Design a protein with these regions (language model features):
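Signature for HUH/AEP ssDNA processing cores
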Residues: 1-46, 56, 85, 107-108
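Residue-level detector of buried hydrophobic side-chain packing
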Residues: 11, 50-51, 80
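Helical (often loop-to-helix) elements that flank the catalytic cores of nucleotide-handling enzymes
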Residues: 20-34, 53-79, 86-95
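Long, charge-rich alpha-helical interaction segments
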Residues: 99-108
Length: 108
């Protein structure tokens, strides 16, 4: 696993795939800005994704109403599966935009 902080962040999309392992529409929208630009892996559940990247440290956020998404950049330990998803690359991109979207939709 990996302890987030020092500029490293992770977006955790839970239950974002259908039975055929195709992304649900909301997950496609979240992934689109960084697809092919940052490392993305299948989460331990097998039907979720971890989008790894860089972002300034900020409060963790979660939304459950419109989508099952969480965003963390500090004080959180994330499991690393090393199961790349799609055209995942071996580098990290800035995921601040995705973090911002999840924060705006966050469940209070």
């Amino acid at each position: 696993g990996f302890a987030l902080g020092d500029g490293f962040a992770c977006i955790d999309l839970d239950h974002c795939m259908d039975a055929s392992h195709r992304l649900l529409p909301w997950a496609k929208m979240i992934l689109a800005p960084v697809e092919g630009k940052t490392y993305v892996e299948v989460s331990p559940s097998g039907d979720g994704l971890h989008i790894w990247g860089t972002c300034a440290e900020r409060k963790g956020v979660r939304t459950r109403d419109l989508m099952n998404a969480e965003a963390y950049s500090q004080g959180r330990y994330m499991t690393v599966t090393m199961k790349p998803y799609g055209n995942a690359v071996d580098r990290l991109a800035d995921i601040t935009l995705i973090y911002d979207v999840i924060e705006r939709l966050a469940t209070p």
